[in-house]
Amino acid sequence: MTHLEPDALEFDPSGHPYSHRYGDVYSSRDGALGQARHVFLAGNDLPQRWADRRQFVILETGFGLGTNFLATWQAWRNDPRRPQRLHFVSVELHPVRSQDLQLPEPLQGDALQDLRAQLATQWPMRVAGMHRIEFD
């Protein structure tokens, strides 16, 4: 079994999650949730594209702290025209630790805290391979 090395989560002086390995913040300093909604959800027209379908598949490279996933999950849950099943596929070479998933973003408080906690509870071991977790 090949264990994956987690990214060592650090924080920049303003309190935003930072990856020393990649020399970058995990999300916009203007707010991760707003960025995910504007760039990922709206930028890809996801709610319009998944409307009234039986199922819909999203592929994301670089899961990070899961903000795009969490924003998508929240939008899917709140959408009366959502597909019956949403498949969110993501790849990550250096997954964070489950406890890192529960850290609220500095500018959004705990808007996604319930979803973060559910994700952290089911977060798989850091071993190479395919991992499947299911919600809702």
Predicted regions and their residues:
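S-adenosyl-L-methionine
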Residues: 101-136
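Short, solvent-exposed loop/turn segments at secondary-structure junctions
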Residues: 64, 95-96
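Class I SAM-dependent methyltransferase Rossmann-like catalytic core
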Residues: 2-56, 64-82
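Conserved acidic E/D residue at the C-terminus of a beta-strand in Rossmann-like folds
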Residues: 89-95
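Conserved beta-strand elements of the Class I
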Residues: 57-59, 89
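Alpha-helix boundary/interfacial micro-motifs
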Residues: 31, 47, 79, 96, ...
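Short, conserved acidic/polar surface loops in the N-terminal third of protein domains
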Residues: 70-73, 99-103
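Residues at the starts of beta-strands that form the adenosine-phosphate
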Residues: 85-87
